[in-house]
Amino acid sequence: MTAKKSLTIFDHVLVPEHRVLSKEETEELLKKYNIKPSQLPQIKTSDPAVQALDAKPGDIIEIKRKSPTAGVYYYYRIVVED
């Protein structure tokens, strides 16, 4: 008998890597860019990536994107309620 492999949204080639920042990383990010959490782009709790990470409103998500010109760059979003 073969076991079925459980796939996640992150297994798809077009979905970039996501992760929830720790409290310390969040503080460093906000201090580095001299911003408030409300100044970050938003991502809703209904987003499949947010649900897969079990992120809560107020968490900051780091998205690692690949670019043919910039190489790898990071994008940050704050989780908000729908």
UniProtKB/Swiss-Prot annotation:
| Gene Ontology BP term (one) | transcription by RNA polymerase II
EC supergroup of this enzyme: transferase
State whether keyword Transcription applies.
yes
Single GO cellular component annotation? Answer: cytoplasm
Which reaction does this chain catalyze?
Answer: RNA(n) + a ribonucleoside 5'-triphosphate = RNA(n+1) + diphosphate
Main localization category: cytoplasm
PROSITE patterns the UniProt entry points to: RNA_POL_H_23KD
To which protein family does this belong? Belongs to the archaeal Rpo5/eukaryotic RPB5 RNA polymerase subunit family.
Q: What does this protein do?
A: DNA-dependent RNA polymerase (RNAP) catalyzes the transcription of DNA into RNA using the four ribonucleoside triphosphates as substrates.
Q: What is this protein called?
A: DNA-directed RNA polymerase subunit Rpo5
